[in-house]
Design a protein with these regions (language model features):
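Ferredoxin-like iron-sulfur electron-transfer modules
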Residues: 89-95, 117-146, 150-168
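Repeat-unit-sized solenoid/scaffold elements
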Residues: 107-117, 167-170
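Iron-sulfur-associated redox domains of electron-transfer enzymes in respiratory
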Residues: 1-112
């Protein structure tokens, strides 16, 4: 029997809803960024970034793998992850979403893999794609710097989305 990988990319609004729907929260270091730091390649993004909810949070806390946080702290962590341009990846479980990893394209294994091999749909799914309003784009290139999978390029001083590479993270 096939075991499906139901990892999904979640926009900020959906992660906010997941947080609102839960009452137990835990946060742990991003294992990908932690490994990179140990190997001497420290990432400048948020380290304590992976959240678990409900019984998964209980398990992580009880086993010393994460610390308990409040709902308000979970909301603040999401805001910080968003400010850092991190991609909100959820694991899917028949009981609901139990984990959110806030991933960077430079150190997180799944995002680095899909970027290196140009395979965005292989590992990550989303129902969204980035969009650019050509009339309001100022050509500041902030979006190209924030895109964790390098799916935004500048064309004639206007941001252009490479839809084959976009994973719809926001």
């Amino acid at each position: 029997q096939e075991i499906k990988d139901d990892r999904e990319i979640q926009p900020y609004e959906q992660v906010s809803e997941i947080i609102e729907a839960n009452s137990k929260f835990a946060v742990a270091d991003c294992i990908c960024r932690k490994e990179s730091e140990i190997m001497g390649d420290k990432c400048d993004k948020l380290l304590e970034a992976c959240m678990s909810f409900g019984f998964a949070a209980d398990y992580y806390i009880e086993n010393g793998m994460a610390r308990e946080i409040s709902k308000e702290e979970a909301k603040q962590l999401l805001i910080k992850a968003e400010e850092d341009g991190l991609v909100h990846c959820s694991s899917n479980h028949k009981g609901g979403k139990m984990f959110i990893c806030n991933c960077c394209g430079c150190h997180c294994k799944a995002l680095a893999f899909i970027t290196k091999h140009d395979l965005p749909g292989l590992i990550a799914q989303s129902n969204y794609y980035a969009a650019v309003d050509d009339d309001t784009c100022e050509g500041c290139e902030t979006c190209t710097e924030r895109c964790q999978v390098n799916a935004i390029k500048m064309v004639d001083e206007v941001a252009s989305i490479t839809y084959d590479g976009c994973i719809g993270c926001g």
